[in-house]
Amino acid sequence: MTLFEKILAARGLTTRAACEEFLNPNYASVKHDPFLLPDMKKAVDRLKKAHAEGEKIVIYGDYDIDGLSATAILLDAFGKFGFKEVGAFIPNRFVEGYGMTMGAVDKVRNMGADLIVTVDTGSLCHAEIEYASSLGIDTVVTDHHNVAETPPPSVAAVNPKFPGHKYPFRDLCGAGVAFKLVQALQTELDGLPDGYEKWLLDLVALGTVCDIVTLADENRANVYWGLEVLKKQRRPGLKALMSVAGIEPEKVNARHLGFGLGPRMNAAGRLETAQYALDMLTASDGLEALEASEKLEELNIKRRSIQDEIFDEACQQADNMTDDRVLVVNSDNWNHGVIGIVASKLVEKYKKPVFIIGERGDEATGSARSFGDFSAADAVRAADDIIIKGGGHGAAAGVTLATERIDDFRRRVNEFYDSLQLKNQELYLLPRADVEIDDFSEINEELIDNLAKMEPFGNGNAEPILKITEATVLNVRRMGADGQHVKLTLRDKNDVALQMLAFNAPEEFFREVGDEVSAWFQPTVNEWQGMRSVEGRLLHLA
C-alpha cells in the first residue's frame, strides 16, 4: 500500500468506489431536491407573486463572507430571473450590529421594500420580522444557523436546521441555502436554464469555505466545482481580488479562499462597512472591480496593523496572568471588529481559553475562543447573572457586560473552569497525524500531486498530516526580520533529508543540531525562481 493509499484509508476510503466518489465529486449526484427543505415551496410561491406583481425585493444579508456571498448569489440570479426591483441591505457591525434589528427594518422600509429575503440570518429574528409585517413588509427567511423551538413569523423559513424535513444534508452554509432557493426558482421561472446555475458556484464555494461548514456531500461538490468556475475568472470582482492578493487563478484552491480572499473581504466589515466587499462581488466591469479590490486590500493592511497592535497589548496583560486558567484581557481602545481574530492568536500562543473584551464607555463587548472540553458558551452561561447578554458554542462565543463587571467576569469564568476539573486540555491543540512514517522515501512530487486530488481541504476534510517518528536535526536556520521563522533540515534513518518550514514559530521549534525529534508536518512544494522542491510545513515537534 502506497503512502497515499494509507492516507485515504485513514480517512475511511478503503474501496475503489469510495475513493473514486471522493476524488471526483459529482455535482449531479448530490444536487438534492431543494423542495425537500422546509418551506421552500412557500418561499418560491411568494417570490413568484413578487415577480408577477413587480414588487420591490430587498435581500437582507449578513456582513460576514457567507452572508455577502449569499447576497451576491441572489442579486445575480434574481437579475437573470427578471425580477424588476431588487436591492440589498448589509447591516453595519458598528451601527445595526449582527442580524436583523428594528432600526435596520426601518431602513429597509425606506428603501421601498415589499418583500425582504434574508440570507444567512433571520431564524431567531421573531420580533423584527413581526415588526416588518406590521409595516406591510413580508419576509422570506433563508438561513442555516440554529433555530428556536418555534419558527419565525415569516411567510417562509428555509433552513436545514429546522426539524421534520427530509432534506438529506443539514450542514449547508448561508450561501448554500441561497443557492438551493435559486435551484428551486429554476423550476418555476425562466431566465436561468438548468445547468447555468453552476456559474454561481464560485460564490457558493467562497461562502462555504469561509464559513467553515463541513466539506462533505453537497458542500464538497459545490466547492470542488466552484473552484473550477473561479479559475475561469468570469466574475470581474473576484478576478481583480485574486490579482490584488497575488493568487494565480489556474492554481486557486480552498486555502486561497480561506486565507487570501476571505481576510480581505472581512476587513471591510471589521473596520468600516461590508458594503465594500459586496461592491467587489457585484462589480460589472474591470475598473470598478479593481477599485473595489484595492479598497479591500487597503483595509486589510490596516486591519493587520490594528490586529498586531491589539495582540501585543493583550500579550502584555496575559503575561501577568500566568495563574489564570482562562485569560480575560480588556482595553478601552480595541476595535470590536478585530478582537475575535486576536482571541484565536492568543489561544495559539498561551494554550488557554481566551476572552478578549473591548470597552465602550459603561458597556463592554467581548469575543471568546476555546478548545477541548471547555465550552466558551457554557462559560458565558455560568456568568449569566453578571453579564447583559451572551451566547455562542463550544469553540467561540460573544458576551456583552457592564465595564465595571469585567473583573467579576474574569473570576467567574476561572471558577467555572476549575469546577470542571479538566486535565491535559492542551493536547486538543496538538495536530493529529493521518499516518506515521519512519522515513521520507515517499515524500515526493508524486505524493504532492496525489494529495492535491483530495482538494478542497477544510472542515471535515483537513489537509493530511504526517508524523515522522524518528529524525535527526541536521540544520537550523532562523529567518525573518526578527528571526521569528525557522527552517529545519531533518534527516531520517536512511540519511534522506527534508527541509521543514514554520512561520512565526514557537521557541520549542528552534532545536539544536543533532537533536532527535518526532515531527508532525504537511508535505508541500516550494517554488522559487522556476525551481520546485518538496518540503514540509512544520506543525509540531516533540
Task: Please annotate each region the language model reported.
Residues 2-115, 135, 187-411, 418-425, ...:
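Hydrophobic helix-and-loop "lid/oligomerization" segment in the mid-to-C-terminal part
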Residues 73, 150-191, 197-209:
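Short alpha-helices
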Residues 112, 119-172:
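Histidine/acidic-residue-rich, glycine-tolerant segments that coordinate divalent metal ions
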Residues 364, 397, 484-488, 532-534:
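Short beta-strand micro-motifs in enzyme catalytic cores
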Residues 405-411, 513-542:
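OB-fold single-stranded nucleic acid-binding module
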Residues 434, 489-491, 501, 520-522, ...:
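Residue-level recognition of well-ordered beta-strand positions that form the cores
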Residues 437-498:
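Accessory interdomain/linker segments of ATP-dependent helicases and helicase-like nucleic-acid enzymes
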Residues 493-511:
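Beta-strand/loop nucleic-acid-binding surfaces
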